[in-house]
UniProtKB/Swiss-Prot annotation:
The gene is waaA. CMP binds at P306, R307, F347, G348, E349, N372, I373, L374, E375. Its EC number is 2.4.99.12. One of its GO terms (molecular function) is Kdo transferase activity. This is 3-deoxy-D-manno-octulosonic acid transferase. It comes from the Bacteria. Its main location: membrane. It comes from Rickettsia prowazekii (strain Madrid E).
């Protein structure tokens, strides 16, 4: 099966190029970094070679005016041999994080692993532009980011030769067969916070043997829920273990305190509703109810944070269709208070707006399986989400059981829920939801992080 996949990846190579070109045209690829899809560019530094080059310079062998041809030839041969004997000053942990949510988990891992092993350096690979933009402002100095190359043996092997990782950690559900199979030849691989959607589970049941061939490359498999453990078992993987969702361990989003102070003063005691990580399907539900909310609660201000900020033009056009006045953050750094809503078309400032929010609706929950509801919980927001939380089933179930969030079915349900929560008579109810959300995330955080780190520690180089 793996040989067949490798063969197909060769045959379909022209198709990969076309896909990358199309992604480039529609803005899903960064033209300045397109070479990374083909494993061209960055690579791990060879400290042994650097050392020899410094030593040679000190001895003067590289000075062509004083060095004989024999010495230069001998020295070049020595440097070449050392370049093949890869020797590095630091161990390298490679973390693959598909997109934004997994990248936040990767940053938490880097922060905590570096405490356990100060000599370790990190390589983060991801697939999306959104993840790269987040990392451009949050990546620590001990880490490097590179886009994951196309899953073809030519590019995968070149990527692995360039980086020579000592440990690989894959987060959640991206299973690139070639990358994983080749990666296991270089270092031990861990699959953590693993999950399988219902759709993927049905597909893998038809290709169970291929799934097993991929998964056997991992030295340890940690799933995020009992439901996922059952799916792995059904697919013939008996050695997986469930430690819960590591997203509980993600650190509270950073907030620029100077910006926060300005925003609080500017909002002038208005109650803020945040609609976070929204997709078009969410906005179809949200935009029609805004005028109704504004009429009932004049002290209410609405902030929309789309999952993909590049959609800003289409969102503003949709606002006009619903007779809503909207301003983008790229146009005004502070909200225009006499407008109906403010659209945050910038990455990396979610924490700033959760800081001033009373209630947060988490998007992607009408069709995409839901996004991370824990980020808002850290800021003691009252959390609302839609009917589809299939990507975060256990977290959604747990937070609902703890009376720390509300799940709605449709637009009418959302309007009724917000109207009830914003009613002055329900102030205590709103306060309880907010307090419970913070308790829920804090109670789970340390235990889960410690358990994950105990496992990872066993494999650190």
């Amino acid at each position: 099966m793996m040989l067949l996949y490798y063969t197909l990846s060769f045959i379909l190579l022209p198709v990969y190029f076309i896909i990358i070109f199309i992604r480039l045209l529609i803005g899903k690829e960064d033209i300045r970094r397109i070479q990374e899809r083909f494993a061209i560019g960055k690579q791990r530094q060879n400290s042994a070679l650097d050392f020899i080059q410094m030593s040679v310079n000190k001895e003067g062998f590289t000075d062509h005016k004083t060095t004989s041809y024999v010495d230069m030839h001998r020295n070049a041969s020595l440097m070449y041999k050392l370049s093949l004997e890869r020797s590095y000053a630091h161990s390298l942990v490679w973390i693959h994080a598909a997109s934004v949510g997994e990248v936040m988990t990767a940053l938490t891992l880097i922060h905590n692993i570096s405490k356990l092993a100060p000599n370790v350096r990190f390589l983060i690979t991801s697939w999306t532009n959104a993840s790269a933009k987040i990392l451009s402002t949050k990546l620590p100095k001990i880490a490097t980011h590179q886009f994951l190359p196309i899953d073809n043996v030519i590019f995968t092997r070149k990527f692995l030769r360039n980086w020579q990782p000592d440990l690989g950690i894959f987060i959640e559900s991206e299973l690139w067969p070639c990358t994983i199979n080749e990666g296991a030849k270089y270092c031990k691989l861990l699959l953590i916070n693993a999950r399988i959607s219902n759709k993927s589970f049905k597909a893998w049941l038809k290709r169970k043997r291929f799934f097993q061939l991929i998964i056997k490359n991992f030295s340890k498999i940690i799933v995020q829920s009992e439901r996922d453990l059952q799916k792995f078992n059904a697919l013939g993987i008996s050695d997986a273990m469930n430690l819960g969702n590591i997203k509980f361990a993600n650190e509270k989003l950073l907030v620029n305190q100077e910006k926060l102070s300005k925003l609080i003063l500017h909002l002038d005691n208005r109650r803020v509703l945040v609609f976070a990580s929204t997709h078009p399907e969410d906005e179809e539900v949200i935009l029609p109810i805004i005028n109704n909310l504004k009429e009932q609660f004049i002290d209410c201000y609405i902030i929309l944070i789309p999952r993909h900020p590049e959609r800003i033009k289409s969102i503003i056009n949709n606002c006009k269709l619903h007779h809503l006045s909207a301003t983008a953050k790229s146009q005004n750094d502070l909200p225009v208070l006499n407008n109906d809503l403010y659209i945050v078309d910038r990455f990396g400032e979610m924490g700033l707006f959760f800081s001033v929010a009373t209630i947060s609706f988490i998007g992607g929950s009408f069709k995409q399986g839901g996004h991370n509801i824990l980020e808002a919980a850290y800021f003691s927001n009252c959390i609302i989400f839609g009917p589809d939380m299939s990507k975060n089933t256990d977290i959604a179930k747990g937070i609902l059981q703890n009376n720390a969030a509300i799940q709605i079915k449709n637009g009418k349900d959302l309007l009724n829920t917000l109207t009830s929560l914003l009613n002055a008579n329900n102030a205590l109810k709103l306060k309880t939801y907010r307090e419970n959300a913070l308790k829920f995330v804090e109670n789970n955080q340390k235990k889960i992080l410690d358990e994950y780190l105990q496992i990872i520690k066993q494999f650190l180089p």
